């Protein structure tokens, strides 16, 4: 949620920034008109209440003097009715203001490139050079099916499209990957591991910005207030929902492995094969709580934490800064890490690391008491560290051999009983 005071004080700046995020100027003008009307009514209500209190005092005096107070009583009744009507109007205007405010995206940081879509994204850096194969590299789904470690056909039979079974060494590889990621984040990067709920209420989904705007992207439990999490960002960020932290506790680092459930609404025809776009997948998530002063420093660290995993796995990747039109709803700035996928001859997203500043904290009421004793909204950050299925896909493709086998990255071998190859 945006800071309403900031909007009122910087209308033109906010309007300009929201426009870069695809928000029509009229939307903000409509909000401001409603808000101005609401505030004007509040002033009027306060004046009427003040008048009612004054009349109430007069009535008390008249009654003590045993004088007629009928006129004053009538006047107070009329004022009370006016207040009741105006209070209802205030509530109605507040509901309209809230409906608009809840759907306004976060304002982009000044360093974010301006653009309508991914074409305006800016590459920051690359790590390693993609391997040159002496043969035509196969896509990961062909490799996995040939080795008998991925079964998309039976996944579709049981659950429909975009589901699969990991089998044998495929399941073991998936497990090795996420255990390696968790160990790195806990032992090397300083995160506290959490096992969160996989079902959350609508309040939690609102807090991180999925609700109300993106309800069609998730799986909701029928006749319930619960939703299957689209990412562990939701339960991890809401851990401190409606709480006040102490500044000395910050920054706080959480990491969690969880399944993620997404309807992939609007993705028809995209990545219909393989592990890139599924309805259910594992992801290791990183979440941070920071003060305002250090949140962008923490974003750089988080991005490096994700990159460290890829580097230790020996997977070539690049980092890009997302443009204003390509960022997620709650983000003020986002870095995407994209891993090299040989069969597609391109880089594909494997992690998004975002600083949401105080946007989510305002929605979820996550605050901290600073050194002066004042209560401030915390800054929240989140990032994939990493998407596990996409990491498995990248390993299968980058480490494939001409004979159809796959070499296991050295750092994963201790997690796979010393195996060096999948054959």
Curated annotation (Swiss-Prot):
List the molecular function annotations (GO) for this entry.
Answer: ATP binding; catalytic activity, acting on a protein; serine-tRNA ligase activity; transferase activity
Which compartments is it annotated to reside in?
Cytoplasm
Q: Which residues bind ATP?
A: 262-264, 349-352
InterPro entries annotated for this entry? aa-tRNA-synt_IIb, aa-tRNA-synth_II, aa-tRNA-synth_II/BPL/LPL, Ser-tRNA-ligase_type_1, Ser-tRNA-synth_1_N, SerRS_1_N_sf, SerRS_core, tRNA-bd_arm
Its EC number is 6.1.1.11
Q: Name one GO cellular component term.
A: cytoplasm
**Catalyzed chemical reaction(s):** tRNA(Ser) + L-serine + ATP = L-seryl-tRNA(Ser) + AMP + diphosphate + H(+); tRNA(Sec) + L-serine + ATP = L-seryl-tRNA(Sec) + AMP + diphosphate + H(+)
- Its domain of life reads Bacteria
**Which residues are involved in binding L-serine?**
231-233, 285, 384
The UniProt entry, under Gene3D superfamilies, shows: Bira Bifunctional Protein, Domain 2 (3.30.930.10), Serine-tRNA synthetase, tRNA binding domain (1.10.287.40)
Principal localization reads cytoplasm
What quaternary structure, including any partners, is listed in this protein's UniProt entry? Answer: Homodimer. The tRNA molecule binds across the dimer.
Q: Which NCBIfam families match?
A: serS
Query: What does this chain do?
Result: Catalyzes the attachment of serine to tRNA(Ser). Is also able to aminoacylate tRNA(Sec) with serine, to form the misacylated tRNA L-seryl-tRNA(Sec), which will be further converted into selenocysteinyl-tRNA(Sec).
Please report which protein family the annotation says this sequence is part of: Belongs to the class-II aminoacyl-tRNA synthetase family. Type-1 seryl-tRNA synthetase subfamily.
Spell out the protein name for this chain.
Answer: Serine--tRNA ligase 1
Origin species, per record, is Enterococcus faecalis (strain ATCC 700802 / V583)
């Amino acid at each position: 949620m945006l800071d309403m005071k900031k909007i009122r004080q910087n209308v033109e700046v906010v309007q300009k920034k929201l426009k870069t995020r695809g928000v029509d100027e009229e939307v903000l003008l409509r909000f401001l008109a409603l808000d101005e009307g609401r505030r004007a009514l509040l002033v009027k209500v306060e004046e009427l209440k003040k008048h009612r209190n004054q009349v109430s005092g007069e009535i008390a005096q008249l009654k003590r003097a045993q004088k007629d107070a009928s006129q004053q009583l009538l006047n107070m009744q009329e004022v009370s009715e006016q207040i009741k009507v105006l209070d209802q109007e205030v509530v109605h205007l507040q509901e309209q203001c809230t409906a608009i405010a809840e759907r306004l995206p976060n304002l982009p940081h000044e360093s974010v490139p301006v653009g309508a879509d991914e074409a305006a994204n800016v590459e920051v850096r690359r790590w390693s050079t993609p391997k040159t194969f002496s043969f035509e590299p196969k896509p990961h789904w062909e490799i996995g099916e040939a080795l008998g470690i991925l079964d998309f056909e039976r996944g579709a039979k049981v659950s429909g499209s975009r589901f699969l079974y990991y089998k044998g060494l495929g399941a073991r590889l998936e497990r090795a990957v996420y255990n390696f990621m968790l160990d790195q984040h806990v032992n090397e990067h300083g995160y506290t591991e959490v096992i969160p709920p996989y079902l959350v209420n609508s309040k939690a989904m609102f807090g991180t910005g999925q609700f109300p705007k993106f309800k069609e992207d998730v799986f909701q439990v029928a006749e319930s207030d619960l939703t299957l999490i689209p990412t562990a960002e939701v339960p991890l960020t809401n851990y401190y929902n409606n709480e006040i932290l102490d500044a000395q506790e910050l920054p706080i680092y959480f990491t969690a492995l969880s399944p993620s459930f997404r309807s992939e609404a609007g993705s028809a025809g995209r990545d219909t094969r393989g592990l890139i776009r599924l309805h259910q997948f594992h992801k290791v998530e990183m979440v941070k709580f920071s003060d305002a002063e250090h949140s962008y420093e923490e974003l750089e660290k988080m991005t490096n934490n994700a990159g460290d995993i890829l580097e230790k796995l020996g997977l070539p990747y690049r980092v890009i800064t997302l443009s204003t039109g390509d960022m997620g709803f709650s983000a003020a700035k986002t870095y995407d890490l994209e891993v090299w996928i040989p069969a597609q001859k391109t880089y594909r997203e494997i992690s998004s690391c975002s600083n949401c500043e105080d946007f989510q904290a305002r929605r979820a009421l996550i605050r901290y008491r600073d050194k002066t004793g004042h209560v401030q909204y915390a800054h929240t950050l989140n990032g994939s560290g990493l998407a596990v299925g996409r990491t498995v896909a990248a390993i299968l493709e980058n480490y494939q051999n001409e004979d159809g086998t796959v070499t296991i990255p050295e750092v994963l071998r201790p997690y796979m009983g010393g195996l060096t190859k999948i054959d």
